[in-house]
């Protein structure tokens, strides 16, 4: 998986305004997946319900969230991963500073194998030295494109 995949599928969203809260952030972060008909809005409600029940499992490392729910969801229409960046960190748990995120990678997959593959590929990509810091510095789709052109 490469960053250019997000750009080629028009799934990059640099949010100009901070989210009101983590629920609002999830709604906004998945906007491109809804717009391009990979998911229905009900999928976001499933993710919100899962976070309310299980805690902020979607924050995989400080600063990065990977919103996803069950693969068997009738609200998933296709397989895709989006990218959204907020200007300020979104707090998921005010008692745990590690449970905040500014970078969101919403996932949708029709196939359980592909879902696990996408999670693994995304996790591997995010372990690239310095990539998270570079993504945090992105302030526009053009910045994102420049990051890709620079070889990230």
Where are these regions (language model features)?
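Cytosolic covalent-transfer regions centered on His/Cys nucleophiles
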Residues: 1-152
């Amino acid at each position: 998986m490469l960053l250019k995949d997000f750009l080629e599928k028009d799934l990059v969203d640099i949010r100009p305004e901070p989210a009101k809260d983590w629920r609002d952030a999830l709604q906004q972060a998945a906007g491109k997946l809804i717009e391009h008909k990979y998911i229905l809005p009900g999928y976001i409600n499933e993710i919100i319900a899962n976070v309310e029940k299980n805690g902020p499992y979607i924050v995989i490392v400080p600063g990065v969230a990977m919103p996803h729910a069950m693969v068997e969801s009738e609200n998933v229409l296709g397989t895709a991963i989006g990218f959204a960046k907020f200007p300020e960190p979104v707090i998921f748990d005010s008692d745990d500073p590690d449970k905040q995120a500014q970078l969101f990678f919403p996932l949708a997959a029709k196939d359980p194998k592909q879902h696990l593959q996408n999670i693994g590929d995304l996790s591997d990509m995010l372990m690239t030295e310095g990539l998270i810091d570079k993504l945090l510095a992105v302030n526009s789709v053009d910045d994102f494109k420049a990051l890709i052109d620079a070889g990230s």
